[in-house]
Amino acid sequence: MPAIQPPLYPTFLLLILLSLIVTLYVWIISTITYKTVVRHAALYQRSFFRWSFDHSL
């Protein structure tokens, strides 16, 4: 009887696992990106302002 049943539970478990992995991956990438942006925000801002000022003259 269990062999005739469709494998609904493993598919459901795999879907949950996949969604968890994707969520964790997105969270890690966003955290790393946020920390990097915050760390280099002042440097990027200064260099961008200097570049725009030099090219506006």
UniProtKB/Swiss-Prot annotation:
It is a single-pass membrane protein. Residues 30-57 are intravirion. One of its GO terms (biological process) is symbiont-mediated suppression of host NF-kappaB cascade. Its main location: virion. It comes from the Viruses. One of its GO terms (cellular component) is membrane. Keywords: Host cell membrane, Host membrane, Host-virus interaction, Inhibition of host NF-kappa-B by virus, Membrane, Transmembrane, Transmembrane helix, Virion. It is found in: Virion membrane; Host cell membrane. Plays a role in the inhibition of the host NF-kappa-B pathway. This inhibition occurs at the receptor level, by preventing the signaling of TNFR1 as well as IL-1R and TLR3. This is Small hydrophobic protein. It comes from Mumps virus genotype B (strain Urabe vaccine AM9).
